[in-house]
């Protein structure tokens, strides 16, 4: 019995040595476990169990290694099959994005004021001024007051700058191809040709001659005389002989419809001439814009006077233009404003009179050099005539005589054809013209 008691006490001691039972911790979340998606779960390797070293763990690790090798091979093949992206294609993609941001069509406006790097005040032709944003891809070094900018059609944000913009009318005035006329095509006018060379051609080709002698070359010349005496022809010959840029404009083109467009066109004309220096600006029929000033209530007359004032400013402004020469031509120099043709602006006035006997003979020889003339043609009869014939009249007589020969199916021009042509030209000039046209 005692043994039983001692055995019972030993069992109680063993129970005291065992740890007490602890319940498991409560779950942190209730319900079904949510599946995680994203880059972490796709790149995370699976957990290998059991953790002890055994054959099963080795097989699982080898299987994971095979999957990783397959993934590596797939990525290598994918990179090889992808087209190579060079810098040009990247730039093209960026330009495409910029074009999408700009939108289409674009509105043209003027930059009135720059507030900061990202904002400006612009004005457009379709409305008032606007406070707009400047997009980040715009080259801000090209922005200046008065610049022509491109605006988004909806938000009117500045999305571009038109650099080096030139008035389309000024581009039309620029003579791209040199005229074919030369000094050999001018009959007579030796004194006029010499004066033109000294005033226009030599300062552009040999400016050092004027520096050595210590004088400033003339800024411009004016050619005046009756119609058809060779003023425009001499200007074309100068353009042919020099390699300078030749800008030709008629005086009536400087008269514009809207207020301020005429002076703006004059500024654009001389700005392009300055950029393309050495250059020659030929203004034909200058009397259309350079007439004498007088008090007038007409808005059109005041606009013409403003255009002439801008022309005066460009001729003798503060900016000295040594490589820009001005040639003017007119039939009525007495109607021009004295301020326009004073020395300092127009230093030489070259008169073109009606041709004398010697000049007439040269002009007839030039225009009949390539004509098939009959043996009975006597040009001295027309040269010695007392009729006031200009160079243009002589050219018209030669052309008309050839047309009369073609009318009769002849390939040679006779003396009779010249007589009929002369009578026809003189009739058109005097009796056939309105009274007072050539006064």
Curated annotation (Swiss-Prot):
> Which positions form S-S bridges?
none
Q: What is its main location?
A: cytoplasm
Q: What's the encoding gene here?
A: psmC1
Q: Which organism is it from?
A: Dictyostelium discoideum (Social amoeba)
* Ranges for region Disordered: 1-46
Q: Where in the cell is it found?
A: Cytoplasm; Nucleus
Q: Top-down, what is the taxonomic lineage of the species of origin? A: Eukaryota, Amoebozoa, Evosea, Eumycetozoa, Dictyostelia
Descriptive protein name: 26S proteasome regulatory subunit 4 homolog
Query: Which biological processes are named by the entry's GO terms?
Result: mitotic cytokinesis; proteasome-mediated ubiquitin-dependent protein catabolic process; sorocarp development
Q: What functional role does this protein have? A: The 26S proteasome is involved in the ATP-dependent degradation of ubiquitinated proteins. The regulatory (or ATPase) complex confers ATP dependency and substrate specificity to the 26S complex. Plays an important role in regulating both growth and multicellular development.
What family name appears in the similarity comment?
A: Belongs to the AAA ATPase family.
Q: Name one GO molecular function term.
A: proteasome-activating activity
């Amino acid at each position: 019995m005692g043994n039983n008691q001692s055995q019972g006490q030993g069992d109680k001691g063993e129970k005291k040595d065992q740890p007490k039972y602890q319940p498991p911790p409560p779950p942190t979340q209730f319900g079904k476990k949510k599946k995680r998606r994203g880059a972490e779960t796709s790149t995370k390797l699976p957990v290998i169990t059991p953790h002890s070293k055994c054959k099963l763990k080795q097989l699982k690790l080898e299987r994971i290694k095979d999957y990783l090798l397959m993934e590596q091979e797939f990525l290598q093949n994918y990179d090889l099959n992808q087209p190579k992206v060079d810098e040009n294609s990247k730039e093209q993609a960026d330009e495409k994005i910029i074009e999408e941001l700009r939108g289409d069509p674009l509105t043209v406006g003027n930059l009135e004021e720059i507030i900061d790097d990202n904002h400006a005040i612009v004005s457009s032709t379709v409305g008032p001024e606007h406070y707009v944003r400047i997009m980040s891809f715009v080259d801000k070094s090209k922005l200046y007051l008065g610049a022509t900018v491109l605006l988004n059609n909806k938000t009117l944000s500045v999305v571009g700058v038109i650099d080096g913009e030139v008035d389309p009318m000024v581009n039309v005035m620029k003579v791209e191809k040199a005229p074919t006329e030369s000094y050999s095509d001018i009959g007579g006018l030796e004194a006029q040709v010499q004066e033109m060379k000294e005033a226009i051609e030599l300062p552009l080709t040999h400016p050092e001659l004027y520096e050595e002698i210590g004088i400033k070359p003339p800024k411009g010349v004016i050619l005046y005389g009756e119609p058809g005496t060779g003023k425009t022809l001499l200007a074309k010959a100068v353009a042919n002989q020099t390699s300078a840029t030749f800008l030709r404009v008629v005086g009536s083109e400087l008269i514009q419809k809207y207020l301020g467009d005429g002076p703006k066109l004059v500024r654009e004309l001389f700005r392009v001439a300055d950029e393309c220096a050495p250059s020659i600006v030929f203004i034909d029929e200058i009397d259309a814009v350079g007439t004498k000033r007088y008090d007038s209530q007409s808005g059109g007359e005041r606009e013409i006077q403003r255009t002439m004032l801008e022309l005066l400013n460009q001729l003798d402004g503060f900016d000295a233009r040594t490589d820009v020469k001005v040639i003017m031509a007119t039939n009525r120099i007495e109607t021009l404003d004295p301020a326009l043709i004073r020395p300092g602006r127009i230093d030489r006035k070259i008169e073109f009179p009606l041709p004398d006997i010697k000049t007439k003979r040269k002009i007839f020889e030039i225009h009949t050099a390539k004509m098939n003339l009959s043996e009975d043609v006597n040009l001295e009869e027309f040269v010695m005539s007392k009729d006031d014939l200009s160079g243009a009249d002589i050219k018209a007589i030669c052309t008309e005589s050839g047309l009369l020969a073609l009318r009769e199916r002849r390939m040679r021009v006779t003396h009779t054809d010249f007589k009929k042509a002369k009578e026809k030209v003189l009739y058109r000039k005097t009796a056939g013209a309105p009274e007072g046209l050539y006064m």
